[in-house]
Amino acid sequence: MTSELPPQIQNQIAQLQQVQQQVQALSMQKSQIEAMQKESKMALEELERLADDAVIYRSVGELVIKTTKEESVSKLKDREETLSLRLQSISRQEERLTARFKQLQEQIQQALGPRAQ
């Protein structure tokens, strides 16, 4: 069927498939970041319950390092902020790509409209 289609429509279909793949990839990234956000929030909630002089260890690569509650809270808050910004950025990209997907879909349907009858 695609060999019967004009090159312009074939190109639009290829773009549509590419945009669809990009939206799926962004959706996966968004899910991963949301999971990381949830982990950070849970860790922060646990830290807040501890005494200020509690002994805390955190993982850094292959090492486990002793740290303070204050430093751990600060790092987790920074991480939450960074993840939130990344999530906002991904959401904006996802919105733009979804709009582009719908636009391409409409263009293809309009171009194929007379052929479908």
Curated annotation (Swiss-Prot):
Entry GO CC: cytoplasm; prefoldin complex
Matches recorded under Pfam families: Prefoldin_2
Compartments where located: Cytoplasm
MF terms (GO), sorted A to Z: protein-folding chaperone binding; unfolded protein binding
Predominant location category: cytoplasm
InterPro entries named among the record's database cross-references: PFD_beta-like (IPR002777), PfdB (IPR012713), Prefoldin (IPR009053)
Family: Belongs to the prefoldin subunit beta family.
Function: Molecular chaperone capable of stabilizing a range of proteins. Seems to fulfill an ATP-independent, HSP70-like function in archaeal de novo protein folding.
Protein name in the entry: Prefoldin subunit beta
Organism of this sequence: Methanosarcina mazei (strain ATCC BAA-159 / DSM 3647 / Goe1 / Go1 / JCM 11833 / OCM 88) (Methanosarcina frisia)
